[in-house]
């Protein structure tokens, strides 16, 4: 809150260990920054993560939120490693999802009229970011998000070659594409490119997004490492379990496996 409101920054990085409460922290930040009445865009890389976040924010919000889900239908989209499906289908979401711009425009207007004093939260995958941009244009210039929360923000780094179209993950940085007053980038694993790589990118007119670029990501205003989270009893320390086997037991297992293979061969012969 101090970073965004009192210092007036429009971008910032929140670095917290996995499981230490990034989602809950972002909810409280959004509520505090907008007095619980803002327009929030929450971006995630998969439908499964969208589902988790939707349920978490709905359950933990101080006041009831008005959620809208935007993501592609996995039944009609091609299955690629870059798709937004994860392990959950659109049909399993707690709220109906759509990528239809007109439906989104209508939903936003309905939600705002029904709950004018509540927080409107658009949950979306990065892959559907162009749909959000088109919906913003359809609604009008007055519809600007108060805050964009970029979860798994290390996914928004990368290289764009000259003449190529930016990926959906990278386009979130552009305020001319998606209009917002503030941007929160949160991750447990910030991705940084070496100085020499950044210099080479400049020489070759390559657009490089690295999380140490404060123009894109803002300053790091809070960090909670795994070790610190354990000290604060937010996480349990991990234990290393090493399994050992002596040679006697190893030989016994090998003999049993050989006997099983022999029995299988005899069975095959008998079946013939």
Language-model regions: role of each:
Residues 8-29:
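Walker A/P-loop
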Residues 7-13, 38, 120:
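Pre-Walker A (Motif I) flank of P-loop NTPase domains
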Residues 1-6:
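Pre-Walker A adenine-sensing motif
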Residues 127-128, 138-185, 189-191:
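SF2 helicase catalytic motif II
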Residues 104-144:
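Conserved helix/coil segment N-terminal to the catalytic DExD/H
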Residues 34-62, 66-81, 126-128:
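Conserved Walker A/P-loop ATP-binding site and its immediately adjacent core
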Residues 69-79, 93-102, 125-131, 155-156:
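Conserved helicase motor
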Residues 195-272:
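Interdomain helical connector at the RecA1-RecA2 junction of SF1/SF2 helicase-like NTPases
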């Amino acid at each position: 809150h101090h970073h965004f409101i009192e210092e007036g920054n429009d971008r910032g990085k929140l670095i917290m260990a996995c499981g230490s409460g990034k989602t809950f922290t972002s909810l409280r930040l959004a509520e505090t920054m907008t007095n619980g009445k803002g327009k929030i865009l929450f971006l995630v890389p998969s439908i499964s993560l969208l589902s988790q976040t939707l349920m978490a924010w709905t359950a933990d919000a101080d006041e009831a939120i008005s959620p809208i889900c935007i993501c592609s239908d996995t039944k009609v989209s091609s299955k690629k490693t870059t798709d937004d499906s994860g392990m959950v289908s659109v049909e399993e979401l707690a709220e109906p999802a759509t990528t239809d711009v007109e439906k989104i425009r209508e939903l936003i207007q309905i939600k705002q009229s029904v709950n004018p004093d509540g927080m409107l939260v658009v949950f979306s995958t990065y892959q559907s970011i162009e749909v959000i941009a088109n919906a913003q244009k359809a609604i009008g210039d007055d519809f600007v998000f108060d805050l964009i929360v970029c979860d798994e923000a290390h996914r928004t780094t990368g290289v764009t070659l000259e003449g190529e179209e930016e990926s959906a993950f990278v386009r979130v940085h552009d305020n001319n594409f998606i209009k917002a007053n503030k941007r929160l980038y949160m991750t447990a694993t910030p991705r940084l490119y070496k100085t020499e790589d950044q210099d080479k990118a400049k020489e070759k007119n390559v657009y490089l997004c690295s999380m140490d670029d404060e123009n894109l990501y803002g300053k790091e205003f809070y960090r909670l490492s795994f070790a610190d989270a354990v000290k604060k009893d937010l996480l349990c320390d991990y234990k290393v379990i090493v399994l050992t086997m002596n040679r006697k037991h190893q030989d016994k297992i090998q003999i049993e496996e050989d006997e099983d293979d022999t029995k299988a061969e005899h069975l095959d012969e008998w079946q013939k």
